[in-house]
């Protein structure tokens, strides 16, 4: 037999040891045959041995050796000689090989993973410091060619080709589920003391946390045509590859069809080449729910139906898929839901058609199906159906979908819980549904997801596997959207038992273990920021009365009047505010619970730690600064108490200045708003002026060509300078010394837009206050400024 009839493979074996054995006469059902028939059977056994041997060789790395036959050499010409490290758990668990009892293909390796660390459909954990990259392997063929010189199979990509990608190789990756983006809220109210409610990512801004593409790199020494990408173990941060559940379902049907086809072919038949792509998503063979028995499809049309379904989604349309949802066979229900999920991934017309075909109520009925695989695909399909489609969201709610989702959330299946929390997150982007979602879901979501996965009342460290982390991320994204709704919704969230405690506990634990860049931390801080919005106006009156404490008016000390023999400027009188703060601290609980966290002195330290330690996620630091801005805003006494606490005990000014130097416009809005509140309540404005003035002046524009921050940032900066100038000669002197006058005069005279009109009025007020320092008039004139520059229009 000529070796040229076979193409060797560069695919690695998944099992470290492979044993070979000839098929017995009993297996061939011809034991005891003699003469020419015996010779034919012996030849068949030899052929079977060669074929099995080639399977083994095809799964081992190729080494340099003797010259290959012409056919193999021609097929392997240009192949890369890269070395590949063995990844025992890096490939699909459905590897095909000859069994010892029958001629059908059976798995030869079953990687096992701890159920406590990964869901049955999550990515394989390579290690904490290793990730998969891809190396292009030139023209090497994949898998052994068919017996009797069948032509080589087409190259298989590094993952199964998506239904959306069949039109071209340059299409985008088909991810596990849609990457969820939250809603950006409009501008806040006219009251600029408060931080506007935390804004979410726009639909155009993708989140790198949810979706990871399988990167492909072509070797510069080989042609792209016919090339393959193989995973190679390299050092680096952990990464994930994700395939849509619909495509995984399709792969199961195809694999089962191949196995049954080979069994029907018999020993002398043509063996179908096994073409599968390397995969880092393992499907456990031990769970019968993952590998449905395709024999159940026989009652729906026999082998032709099986062949049509297992060939992929080409022969299925949306009406047929919706009909499959009503079938009694769970396999058909899975296939129908998988097709709907796949078709509605990014097709708005398909979502509309599915709603007209009554797919929504039929999927809702499957949320709590007895078969867990049906539940997963039904919720996965609904997750895509409601994404960016207000009509489908409303249809889901009208079909009692929220109740069914919360029932499904009680199941202890991570894949199902990921889908349910993802659906809730998608629903929460609709302003019309936020109040209803808050009323119906908050308590159960807190009890089932937030409290258990945040570490509240549990172990001292966060212990989440990858699936649980995604579930918690979805839940906090859902809360982030709800918290930007109405006052009633914010109040309901504040009063929900365990909700605020879970968020604070999670952030504290994340800081302790160095996970402050985590996207769930970002969501949690944004929720706290939104719940702090107009806090003193919306908090219970009894709590507000307790926070007001015993001020000077309660002590019977009118402003400016001496206490006993002390003059108005005496040290004793200056210490009264500090004493009052101490009395109020004694009245605040040292162990805050629930909404008490929102105004607790301890929360100031939490936000300060985030500002100091979070270096990469600017949304988290912006939210922390915004939350501090909210609780230090206004004329309430407690706002002043927390401002002085932040300045004097937490020493927050230096971290804020570090952020101001490098912040973008979004961060500057919150940072300067917070500094504005602190400057109004600071005791020592001279010290604050020395640290602040020069850095703030750098942010002001001085000419037409200079880059200018947004108008609200300009107004905040000028307001800070004004707060300092009216109380500190040091601030007035530094404004003159650091060329602040030139910039203020420029801002005052620039009135070419409504925003510049506002900043012009703020600059005019500051210049008028500067002119009150008579001792500086000579210096003003020396710099070329006149009285009209300060007091003129």
UniProtKB/Swiss-Prot annotation:
Required for binding to PKP2 mRNA: region residues: 513-793
InterPro entries assigned to the protein according to its UniProt record, in alphabetical order: ARM-like, ARM-type_fold, Armadillo, Plakophilin/d_Catenin
PTM notes: Phosphorylated at Ser-282 when localized to the cytoplasm, PKP3 at desmosome cell junctions is not phosphorylated. Phosphorylation at Try-194 by SRC is induced by reactive oxygen species and potentially acts as a release mechanism from desmosome cell-cell junctions.
Record-listed Phosphoserine modification sites: 122, 179, 182, 239, 282, 310-311, 328
Localisation: Nucleus; Cell junction, Desmosome; Cytoplasm; Cell membrane
Residues bearing PTM Phosphothreonine: 249
Residues with the Phosphotyrosine modification: 194
Chain positions covered by the region annotation Disordered: 56-82, 221-240
Topology versus the membrane: Peripheral membrane protein
Site (Interacts with SFN): 282
SMART domains: ARM (SM00185)
Region described as Required for interaction with GSK3B: spans on this chain: 291-720
Pfam families: Arm
Function as written in the Swiss-Prot or TrEMBL entry: A component of desmosome cell-cell junctions which are required for positive regulation of cellular adhesion. Required for the localization of DSG2, DSP and PKP2 to mature desmosome junctions. May also play a role in the maintenance of DSG3 protein abundance in keratinocytes. Required for the formation of DSP-containing desmosome precursors in the cytoplasm during desmosome assembly. Also regulates the accumulation of CDH1 to mature desmosome junctions, via cAMP-dependent signaling and its interaction with activated RAP1A.
Xref: PANTHER family: PLAKOPHILIN-3 (PTHR10372:SF1), PLAKOPHILLIN-RELATED (PTHR10372)
Entry protein name: Plakophilin-3
Native species: Bos taurus
């Amino acid at each position: 037999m000529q070796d040229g009839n076979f193409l060797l493979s560069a695919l690695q074996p998944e099992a470290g040891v492979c044993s070979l054995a000839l098929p017995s006469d009993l297996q061939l059902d011809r034991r005891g045959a003699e003469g020419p028939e015996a010779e034919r059977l012996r030849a068949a056994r030899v052929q079977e041995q060669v074929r099995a041997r080639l399977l083994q060789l095809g799964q081992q790395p190729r080494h340099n050796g003797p010259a290959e036959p012409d056919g193999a050499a021609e097929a392997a010409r240009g192949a890369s000689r890269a070395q590949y490290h063995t990844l025992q758990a890096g490939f699909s668990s459905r590897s095909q090989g000859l069994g010892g009892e029958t001629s059908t293909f059976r798995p030869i390796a079953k990687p096992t993973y701890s159920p406590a660390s990964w869901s049955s459909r999550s990515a394989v954990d390579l290690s904490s410091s290793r990730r998969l990259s891809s190396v292009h392997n030139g023209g090497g063929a994949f898998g052994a060619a068919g017996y009797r010189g069948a032509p080589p199979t087409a190259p298989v990509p590094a993952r199964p080709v998506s239904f959306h990608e069949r039109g071209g190789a340059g299409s985008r990756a088909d991810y596990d589920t849609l990457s969820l983006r939250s809603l950006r809220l409009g501008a806040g109210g006219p009251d600029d003391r408060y931080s506007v409610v935390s804004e979410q990512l726009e639909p155009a801004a993708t989140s790198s946390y949810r979706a990871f593409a399988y990167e492909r790199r072509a070797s510069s020494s080989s042609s792209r045509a016919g090339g393959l990408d193989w995973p190679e173990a390299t050092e680096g941060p952990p990464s994930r590859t994700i395939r849509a559940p619909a495509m995984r379902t399709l792969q199961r049907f195809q694999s089962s069809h191949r196995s049954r086809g080979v069994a029907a072919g018999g020993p002398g038949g043509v063996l179908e080449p096994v073409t599968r792509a390397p995969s880092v998503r393992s499907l456990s063979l031990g769970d019968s729910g993952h590998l449905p028995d395709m024999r159940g499809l026989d009652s729906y049309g026999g082998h032709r139906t099986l062949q049509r379904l297992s060939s992929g989604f080409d022969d299925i349309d949306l009406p047929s898929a919706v009909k499959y949802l009503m079938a009694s066979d769970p396999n058909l229900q899975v296939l129908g839901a998988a097709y709907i999920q796949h078709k509605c991934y990014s097709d708005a017309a398909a979502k509309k058609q599915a709603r007209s075909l009554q797919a929504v109520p039929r999927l809702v009925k499957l949320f709590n199906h007895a078969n867990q695989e049906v539940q997963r695909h039904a919720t996965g399909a609904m997750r895509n159906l409601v994404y960016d489609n207000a009509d489908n969201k409303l249809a889901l709610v009208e079909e009692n979908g929220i109740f069914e989702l919360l029932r499904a959330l009680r199941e202890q299946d991570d894949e199902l819980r990921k889908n349910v929390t993802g659906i809730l997150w998608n629903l929460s982007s609709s302003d019309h549904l936020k109040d209803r979602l808050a009323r119906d879901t908050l308590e159960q979501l807190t009890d089932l997801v937030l409290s258990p996965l945040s570490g509240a009342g549990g172990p001292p460290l966060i212990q989440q596997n990858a699936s649980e982390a995604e579930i918690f991320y979805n839940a906090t994204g859902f809360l982030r959207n709800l918290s930007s709704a109405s006052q009633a919704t914010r109040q309901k969230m504040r009063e929900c038992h365990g909700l605020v405690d879970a968020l604070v506990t999670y952030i504290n634990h994340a800081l302790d273990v160095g996970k402050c860049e985590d996207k769930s931390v970002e969501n949690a801080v944004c929720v706290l920021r939104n719940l702090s919005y107009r806090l003193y106006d919306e908090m219970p009156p009894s709590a507000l009365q307790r926070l007001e404490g015993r001020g000077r008016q309660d002590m019977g000390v009118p402003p400016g009047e001496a206490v006993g023999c002390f003059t108005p400027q005496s040290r004793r009188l200056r210490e009264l505010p500090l004493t009052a703060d101490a009395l109020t601290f004694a009245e605040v609980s040292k162990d805050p619970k629930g909404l008490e966290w929102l105004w607790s002195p301890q929360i100031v330290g939490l936000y300060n730690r985030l500002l100091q330690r979070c270096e990469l996620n600017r949304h988290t630091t912006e939210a922390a600064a915004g939350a501090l801005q909210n609780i230090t805003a206004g004329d309430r006494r407690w706002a002043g108490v927390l401002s002085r606490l932040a300045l004097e005990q937490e020493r927050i000014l230096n971290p804020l200045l570090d952020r101001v130097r490098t912040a973008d416009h979004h961060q500057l809005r919150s940072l300067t708003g917070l500094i504005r509140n602190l400057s109004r309540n600071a005791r020592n404005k001279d010290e604050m002026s020395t640290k602040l003035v020069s850095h703030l002046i750098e942010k002001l524009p001085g000419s037409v060509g200079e880059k200018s921050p947004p108008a609200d940032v300009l107004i905040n900066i000028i307001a800070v300078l004004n707060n300092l100038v009216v109380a500190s000669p040091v601030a007035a002197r530094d404004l003159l010394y650091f060329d602040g006058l030139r910039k203020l005069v420029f801002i005052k005279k620039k009135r070419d837009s409504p925003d510049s009109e506002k900043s012009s009025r703020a600059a005019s007020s500051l210049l008028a206050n500067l002119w009150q320092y008579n001792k500086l008039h000579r210096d003003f004139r020396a710099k070329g400024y006149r009285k009209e520059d300060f007091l003129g229009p």
